[in-house]
Amino acid sequence: MTAIGSDVWLGIDLGTQGVRVVVAASDGSLLGAGSCPLTSHREGDRHEQHPEQWWRAVRTAIGRAHAAGADLRRVQGVAVDATSGTITMLDRSGLCVTPALMYDDGRAAAETDQVNAAGERQWAKAGYQRMQRSWALPKLRWLLNHYPHAAEDGWRVAHQNDAINSKLVGHEVPTDTSNALKTGADAAQVTWPERVLDALEIPRAMLPDLVLPGTVIGQVCAAAAAETGLTEGTAVVAGTTDGCAAQLGSGATAVGSWNSVMGTTLVLKGVTKDLVRDPHGVVYSHRSPSGHWLPGGASSVGAGLVAREFADADLDMLTREAGALLPTDLLRYPLVSPGERFPFIAPDARAFGSREPATRAESFAALLQGAAYVERLCFDYVDLLGAPTDGAIVLTGGATRNPLWNQLRADVLQRPVSLPRNTQPALGMAVLAASSRAPLDSVAAAMVQLDRTLEPRRSAKNPHEEGYLRLLDLLVQRGWLPGVVATHARERTAP
């Protein structure tokens, strides 16, 4: 039971397939949750959403959280996360006037070359070296090419959560450096790179002001209060991207700690005191509300293949059979889609296996093992960059529903891994909202409740070392994994 005097916070996760809302107390008690689906359109490199559905979905999800028992009158603050790199444009009255170009929309290939030529020094300073065509700044240049009257008509850029925040407060709002990172924001200085923008002919007036995540940017206005049930005057707090939100919701906020999300794909995010600079452009860093840095990367390996390859299988039985086969000498690199982004960049990478599986259970075992090996290589990579990896490792994502996979990941890493009781970005936004009143680490420690910690099974020699080293060799042979990375990973396997 939550104490009557306990503060309450509301987090909104604005995703691709839906909006999720969590109402949580300062002690971590979940008081209510709600969701509402979203639709989008994919065609080739194109991926769009109609932004007008976002506010309707947010209102519906908040209403469902209230119906589930949350007393919205007690909410002290609201924060919204969004998919990284998703942008739209608003007119002078705040209405969305273009489709939203989603986080993985890839139409801005030519504009990406233009952006990287103009901002080469700035992107190197930021640590990620080059922008990718799915990032927001190339997409903004693409929008301006297709809507040449935008600047004259007073249009301005809005990240996905900016559109919701402006609805909540009733006027234009600053954006957070996390969502603005892929639009070119200098997170260290909390400024826009105006020389780069000038070179790209992007008016500075088209971009919102910048603040760090966790900054109070306004209060719920009367109109939004009437539509949502929130109290007028409730604080609206600058949010972050969905990946950073998931990290906050995992409780991995202290320097050296890491959140490894094995969902459809693998995302690894950590906390460092200083900015991590990556000469290979694989890892990029967001700013934490605490002022620390949140380096990370997203692989194209993950649990997405489970649904694709084993949709008709009895997964419980398959898991039992796979457990008896581990470790297996069948090595798989289980890419969900072509191309790899982390722990190396290889656009031509394709999923592969070292041989044909003898049984379906062996193929399943090799999938679990392969993803765990890639996760280990990701940790080896960030260690090579100088990031501390000695803190807690928290596992989240759909793969954590498989107990065999959880234990396998601990065994491969030879590190304890923890699993939170509630794992969702919306909870991370409730944590972020609460951090506007108290230090982030203390807020996360109070609000994120761990379910259990798994210890790795110890032996004189890690039974997975031989397979891991063989996988490194296969990746080097294909020309995907740089030799310096493979050498460092091999050195870290030495006793």
Q: Which functions belong to the PLM regions below?
A:
Residues D105:
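Carbohydrate-associated surface elements
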Residues T88, A110-Q114, A246-L248:
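Pocket-flanking alpha-helical
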Residues L200-L212:
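A conserved helix-loop-beta module that forms one wall/lid of the active-site cleft
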Residues T2-I4, L10-G11, N116-R130, W135-G154, ...:
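Active-site core segments that coordinate phosphate-bearing ligands/cofactors
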Residues G18, R74-G77, D209, S354, ...:
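Residues at the N-termini of beta-strands
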Residues M1-P99, D153, A225-A226, L230-A235, ...:
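N-terminal glycine/serine-rich phosphate-binding loop of ATP-dependent small-molecule kinases
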Residues G32-C36, P208, R452:
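Structural signal for short hydrophobic segments within the conserved structured cores
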Residues A67-M102, Y128-S134, N161, N165-D186, ...:
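Short beta-strand-loop/turn "lid" adjacent to the catalytic site in phosphate-handling enzymes
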